[in-house]
Amino acid sequence: KQKLIRTMFKKVFFSSFFLIFFFSNLNANEVDLNDPYYKIGWKNLENPENTSIIIPDANASIEIIETEIYLDSKENIKKRLDLINEQETNIEDIYEKLIIFDREEYYKINIEYNDAGYITSDRFKNFTSSNLLETMNKRMSDSTSKVSWLIEPSLSENNLSTYAYKIEWLDGDITYEYKSLILGREGYIELTIFLFGDGNELEDFFDYYSGVIKEIASTVKFNETYSYSDYQQDDYVSVNTLTNL
């Protein structure tokens, strides 16, 4: 089912561009295993399968499909950054311990676990999306011009909050961020898709990435006794609430 849904999103989004890119992407699914890029610890690279993988340190898992590959350690993520940036990366600047790539690199998902404690969500229900956007704009750096919602934040009955926003920068750049927060008993898991744009993206573009982040986030499962509903009265409660994240 997961493979069908994710593949469907890809087909819808890219069908109109198929003829243009067909020849240049003819071998997109073929991987040169001798390429240094593919020797840094990628998993699900050979003999790919649909499976569930562990989210490091989170007492949780997430499902991947056979067209996805992943790195699940800061050390291997650092190797990738060193290669693509052609310079040394400080491992202390790397916060995620898991990244998932579509094999054709249509998307990359950073996955980070924060053991901040139990995150209360009561205040979130009293805030409007306008309130939250105002707070976000105040938090943004002086180099930003405007922040606007692509997906207004909401909280599901499964304690999952998905939202997305567009950032217009003073230098003319435009970026998009799609996020899902999955609340657990001792902290939360954050999924992020970060994209560059030019402001001329079509609706299919936004529908595609909205579908991807929501579908993948829905596969996250905390282990027994670690889910949000397993909270006990003497558990540590974070100083942050959902509205602060």
Question: Where are the language model's segments positioned?
Answer:
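Bacterial N-terminal signal peptides that target proteins for export
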Residues: L4-F14
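Sec-dependent N-terminal signal peptides
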Residues: V12-F22
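Boundary at the C-terminal end of the N-terminal hydrophobic targeting segment
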Residues: L26-E30
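N-terminal low-complexity, Pro/Thr/Ser-rich intrinsically disordered segments
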Residues: V31-N47
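Short, well-structured beta-strand
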Residues: D32, E105-N110, K146-N240
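Secretory pathway targeting signatures of secreted, lumenal, and periplasmic proteins
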Residues: W42-N44, E49-L132, Q232-L245
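Stable alpha-helical elements in mature extracytoplasmic
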Residues: T128, L132, M136, Y209-I216
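Acidic, glycine-rich loop-and-strand cores that form catalytic or ligand-binding grooves
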Residues: N131-P153
